[in-house]
Amino acid sequence: MVIRSKEQPVVPLGALATTGAIILAARSMKRGEKLRTQVYFRYRVVFQLITLVALVAGGVMMQQESAEQKKTREDKLREKAKQREKLWIEELERRDALIQERKRRLEESRAELKKMAEEGFKQENDNSKGK
């Protein structure tokens, strides 16, 4: 209620003015002052009309603001999605670099083992021939 009152301050003021007009009309009716009673009831109608106009105008303004808020919210969500996508791509690139490094080291290890095996076979062959 307090939040709505801050968003549309004219509506609660109109409601208070309408209530005041009704109270004054009731008091003047109790005293038998017919003319004043009529005047207060006319004030009540005017205050209710002002309150209603303020309520409708506030609703229209809130709709426009909420459309703008929705647009900014969608923009923020798009930006957040772009950031997530960028982070994901960076993570994939990092993982790919690790995989490529592992493959390179594996190939180096294989080449080294193959070289060592060939040297070992050569030594065995040389030792066999030398006997």
UniProtKB/Swiss-Prot annotation:
GO cellular component: mitochondrial inner membrane; respiratory chain complex
TM segment ranges: 10-27, 40-62
Primary location: mitochondrion
GO terms (BP aspect): mitochondrial cytochrome c oxidase assembly; mitochondrial respirasome assembly; regulation of proton transport
Keywords recorded for this protein, A-Z: Coiled coil, Membrane, Mitochondrion, Transmembrane, Transmembrane helix
Domain HIG1 residue range list: 1-73
InterPro entries attached to this UniProt entry: Hypoxia_induced_domain, RCF1
Entry superkingdom: Eukaryota
Membrane topology: Multi-pass membrane protein
Coiled coil start-end: 62-120
Compartments reported by the entry: Mitochondrion membrane
Family: Belongs to the RCF1 family.
Role according to the record: Cytochrome c oxidase subunit which plays a role in assembly of respiratory supercomplexes.
Subunit text: Associates with the respiratory chain complex III/complex IV supercomplex.
Name of the featured protein: Respiratory supercomplex factor 1, mitochondrial
